[in-house]
């Protein structure tokens, strides 16, 4: 098998990773704007990324896989930074720290809010990925609750975790669309008060 030679001192694998990263960034730029994913084209994505069209298919088999990869990439970064914010907070402030980080992240970069929480996106790939991300954050929430209560995650913890994550998601979505007239600090205060209200241990007893 012939090995790919370095080009301008950059190995082939690094060039591929660089092109993929540029395509993902272009995807966030386009999907986080007012463009409906149904209107995305491979040519448009590559033009935004500044790469030749042929390079799209070395990383993604089709447009739906690309949209899913952009969403996964965004969620992975948001989850990692949110977990870091929670870990750095005092025990009694961890719910607020996580919520504040999410709200302030989408306030700093509105593209994140439109992609992850926006009502205007009806693309099937995005809808599926949102469902997956809610399940993922519910799992993280359940682990957090289980650690606080010092007990294994059970069905009641799972039920509350899904309820809280779904409620927070819909509330942020309504806030972004202008349906909730609160500033970001007030929103975090309100969400924190609601989430903290689910800290009653009796809710989680079998």
Name each model feature, range by range.
Residues 83-111:
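Hydrophobic alpha-helical connector segments
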């Amino acid at each position: 098998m012939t090995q790919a030679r370095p080009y301008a001192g950059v190995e082939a694998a690094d060039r591929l990773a660089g092109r993929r990263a540029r395509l993902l960034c272009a995807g966030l730029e386009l999907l986080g704007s007012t463009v409906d994913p149904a209107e995305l084209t491979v040519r448009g994505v590559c033009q935004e990324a500044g790469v030749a069209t042929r390079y799209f298919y070395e990383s993604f088999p089709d447009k739906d896989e690309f949209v899913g990869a952009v969403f996964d990439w965004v969620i992975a970064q948001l989850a990692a930074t949110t977990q870091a914010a929670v870990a750095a907070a005092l025990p009694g402030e961890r719910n607020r720290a996580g919520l504040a980080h999410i709200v302030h992240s989408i306030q700093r970069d509105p593209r994140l809010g439109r992609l992850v929480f926006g009502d205007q996106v009806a693309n099937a790939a995005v809808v599926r990925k949102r469902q997956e991300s809610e399940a993922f954050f519910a799992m993280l929430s359940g682990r957090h609750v289980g650690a606080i209560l010092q007990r294994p995650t059970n069905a009641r913890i799972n039920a509350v975790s899904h309820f809280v994550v779904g409620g927070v998601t819909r509330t942020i979505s309504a806030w972004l669309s202008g349906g909730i007239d609160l500033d970001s600090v007030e929103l975090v205060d309100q969400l924190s008060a609601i989430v903290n209200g689910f800290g009653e241990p009796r809710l989680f007893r079998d």
